[in-house]
Amino acid sequence: MAEPGAGLWADRTFLREVQYQTDRNLAARQSIYAYQQPPVNLMSQVLDLAAPCGFEVVADIGCGNGLYLAELGRRRHAGPFLGVDMSPGMLRAARQRAGDTARRSPALLAADATALPLRNAATDLTLAMHMLYHVPEPGQAIAELRRVTRPGGRLIVGLNGTDHLQEMRDVITAALASIGRDRAPRERLTLDQGETLLRPVFASVTRHDFVSRLLLPGPEPVADYVRSLPETKGVATPESVIAAVTSRLPDRPGAAFEVTTHSGCLVCA
């Protein structure tokens, strides 16, 4: 296992056995988007762009707790759809979520994105949403995504811009520094970097950016977010980090902590 810090975001053992043993940490980070103004429904945006039709084969690589699989189910996608994740805990959460919404359950596989157990040209549409920054060798994963996506099919990769949650990261960085910790959270692989890696591999790469903001009304959602981060794992007193973070938030009555959100997707063909 890697040393604590930014490297934990791509440490397979840590991710599988600690960070994503269940979907609790991921769900905590997902929950802050309830405070997004104006709201961006990224799942709908991505699937509207992809427009899967009829009986296309869809694979969600790094499916996490199954948000996109569940959305496919809600849309009554008629073709086969598959979720792949290296974490059994994530797959359990994905199965439960999809089972709550879909008329049928997706197939689910435990596998690494750099060695997918799929034949060449197996999928019509491949999703890789907010997962490449968890891969130690993103170029190798991109080669696999290219391999399993049929000629004429589409790959959609989701990543974040360099300014995504910048205000939150600034506050967390200052709080960690105040207790002598150097574990500044950062985007390990950004939207710009992903685009640079994908363009030599695909004939066409179209970028879509979705910029908004969070208006966080108090310390609770910030505290939940901080608890979910790898950077706070192994800290003897994580609550001291949370206290240091929340002490830096606006303290005026009714004042919200405003945080930039900048997600995007790259549609590759």
Listing of model-derived features with the role each one plays in the protein:
Residues 39, 189, 196-269:
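Conserved Class I S-adenosyl-L-methionine
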Residues 114-125:
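A short acidic, Gly/Pro-enriched loop at the edge of an enzyme's catalytic core
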Residues 57-115:
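Class I SAM-dependent methyltransferase SAM/SAH-binding core
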Residues 57, 153-154:
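Short glycine-centered segments of the SAM/dcSAM-binding site in methyltransferase folds
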Residues 2-55, 67-68, 156-181:
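Conserved class I S-adenosyl-L-methionine
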